[in-house]
Amino acid sequence: MAAYAQFGYAGYPTANQLTTANTDSQSGHGGGSPLSGTNEASLSPSGGSTATGLTAGPLSPGAVSQSSHHAGHKGLSTSPAEDVVGGDVPVGLSSAAQDLPSRGSCCENGRPIITDPVSGQTVCSCQYDPARLAIGGYSRMALPSGGVGVGVYGGPYPSNEQNPYPSIGVDNSAFYAPLSNPYGIKDTSPSTEMSAWTSASLQSTTGYYSYDPTLAAYGYGPNYDLAARRKNATRESTATLKAWLSEHKKNPYPTKGEKIMLAIITKMTLTQVSTWFANARRRLKKENKMTWEPKNKTEDDDDGMMSDDEKEKDAGDGGKLSTEAFDPGNQLIKSELGKAEKEVDSSGDQKLDLDREPHNLVAMRGLAPYATPPGAHPMHAAYSSYAQSHNTHTHPHPQQMQHHQQQQQQQQNQQQLQHHQMDQPYYHPGGYGQEESGEFAAQKNPLSRDCGIPVPASKPKIWSVADTAACKTPPPTAAYLGQNFYPPSSADQQLPHQPLQQHQQQQLQQLQQQQQHHHHPHHHHPHHSMELGSPLSMMSSYAGGSPYSRIPTAYTEAMGMHLPSSSSSSSSTGKLPPTHIHPAPQRVGFPEIQPDTPPQTPPTMKLNSSGGSSSSSGSSHSSSMHSVTPVTVASMVNILYSNTDSGYGHGHSHGHGHGHGHGLGHGHGLGHGHGHMGVTSNAYLTEGGRSGS
C-alpha cells in the first residue's frame, strides 16, 4: 500500500483489506472505512465510491469501480452521492460525478483485457476512464483535498514524490529515454498490486520517434539503413560524377581520395563510384570520344570491381557489340566472319587443286549442299550445284573418252532420260569446280528446307558430322552411292558425253585400268570402268564405309538407289527395251532396317520390296556369267555392302561394289562384280544386282 499511497492510488484496496471491509462497505457509508486514507473522497480515484467483490476481478485505475464479469462475482458500483459523507465531495465534481453511469468494467469501452504476468490477475488495459477525462482529470489526478505534487500535465500529483514516471510529462532526452525503464517502480515495490500496473502499457514520449534516437546525431532519416546505402544510382547522384568526368576528360581516373569524396557526395558506395567511371570510360571509348591514354592493356583497372547489379546494368545498355566487332548483315562477329572467309578462300583453293589432289569430302562422300531447287530431286540439286545445266556439258574429259566407246545406245538413253529425268537423282557431271557461283548459290540457301538449321552463306563445303546428323535425310555418303548418279531409266540412258568427276578418276585410275578390260561385251555402259573408280569402292577400302552404307533406307531411296529388278537374261544382255530394263524398283540392302526419320522421297521413288532376293540372285548369276576377273581390294570390300547372297545391285550402282555383292552370292562373285561394274547395263546408283545388270 505504500506504493498506492505514494502514487496517489490509496483508494485501491488490497485483497486482504477488501475481505475485512465488506461489512462496512455494504452499509453504503464510507466514514471510518479502512479503505480510506485521510479522506475517502479526495484520495479515492473513484471519487469516494467503494467497491466490493474485487478479490478476483480485474483491477483498473478507472474512475468507476470495476468488477469482473465472471460468474459468481458481483460488482457493486455506487455513485459518489451514495458514498460521500457531508460535503467531502467538491461542488464542481459532485455535479459531474453524479452524471457518471454505473459501469461493470472499463473494458466495455472496447479495450482489451490483459493478464498480469506476475499475479495472474486479469487487468483491463485502459488507464483512463472517458468520463473522468471529460472533466479534465487523469485517473490519478488528486482532488482539491489531495496532496500537492507535480501533475502529469501541470496538474498536482497527490504525492510528495516527484513524478515516479519520468517518461510521462517530462521531455527526457531522446538519446537516453529508450534506455531508461519507465516502469522502474516494479523494482521499488514488487508487490502483486504494482506488478499488475507495471504491465499496463504506458506510452512514453519517445514512442513518437520511428527510429532509434541514437541515430539522430547523424542527421539521417528514420528509414535510412546504414548497411544498405544506395542500391541504384540516380540521375541526381550521377550528375555529380558526370560533372567530375567532364572536368577531367584528359585523365578520367579519379584517385582514391576523389572516389571517396564523390561517394560521400552522391551517397553511393566506393565500388559503385569506381564502376561508374569504368563504364563511363568504356562508353566513351566505344563512341570514339576517348581523349586520354589508357593506363594498361585492359584500359581499366576498375573493371574487376564491378558489382553484380552494375554488371547487369552495363550489359543492358552498353553490353551490345558495337559495329566494329559485329557485322549485322552476316550475323557474325567480325572475328568469326574473318575465319569463315578464310575457310571459304581455302575451300576455293581446294577446288583449284582438285585436279592434283581430291581432298574435298563433299564430292568424296557424295554430300550435297543441302539446298535443292524446288522442282528438282534433292540429290539432283546437290550435284547440279557444281554445274548449272546437266544437259549442256558436252566436253568429255580425256580420261572419260576411253569409257564412252559404246555409243550405239545413245538413242535409247535419251528416250529413257526424258521419262526418268526428274524421277530419280542423277549425278550432274559438270566437274567439281567448274562453276563456283553455282556451288555457292546452292549453299547460300540455308539448311532450313531439309534440316531447319540455318547455315551462314560463308559455310565451307566440308560439312561437319553434326550437320549431317541434324538433317532429316542426310545425304548418303559416296561409299554407299558413289558420285556417279544417273537417271533411273537404265544404264544406257547415260549420255556418252557426261563427264565423270576428275578427282574420282585420278584416285582410282589403277582400279579402273585393271577393270577396263573386264567390261562385258553385251553391255554398253558408258562408265563401267569408272564405276569401280567411284568413291564407293574407294571409300569401302577404308573398311569403314559410310554410316549409311548398310542401311537401305530413305537415304538410299532418295538417292535413287533402287534398281529395277530384272531377269538375269535381261541384265546380262542389256538389250531389252527400256521398259523391260526398268521393272518395279526394289529395296537395296537390308530391308528390315529403317531410319528414324520418314523417307522424304518423291512418290515415284517408292521402292517395291518384293523380289529382292530373287533379283539379286539373278544378278549374281548374270555377274558370274559375265566374266571372271581378278578380285580387287575394292571388290573385296564391297562385300560389306552387299548381302551374302545378293550383292544387290551393287552391280548397277556403278561398280560400287556391286559386283562384289554378286561374288558373295555365288562365290564367284568378286570378279563378276567387276565385270558388272564396268558393264552394268543400268547406270542406276541403286544397288545393281537387282537391276538386272
From Swiss-Prot:
A GO cellular component annotation in the UniProt record: nucleus
Biased composition (Basic and acidic residues): 288-298, 308-317
Ranges for region Disordered: 20-104, 288-331, 387-453, 480-538, 561-627, 648-693
Subcellular location(s) of the protein: Nucleus
Biased composition (Low complexity): 41-59, 397-419, 493-515, 609-627
DNA-binding region: 226-288
InterPro entries (alphabetical): HD (IPR001356), Homeobox_CS (IPR017970), Homeodomain-like_sf (IPR009057), Iroquois_homeo (IPR003893), KN_HD (IPR008422)
Basic residues: bias regions: 516-527, 651-675
Keyword field contains Repressor: no
Major location (coarse): nucleus
UniProt-recorded Gene Ontology molecular function terms: DNA-binding transcription factor activity; DNA-binding transcription factor activity, RNA polymerase II-specific; RNA polymerase II cis-regulatory region sequence-specific DNA binding
General function of this protein: Controls proneural and vein forming genes. Positive transcriptional controller of ac-sc (achaete-scute). May act as an activator that interacts with the transcriptional complex assembled on the ac and sc promoters and participates in transcription initiation.
Annotated protein name in UniProt: Homeobox protein caupolican
Biological source species: Drosophila melanogaster
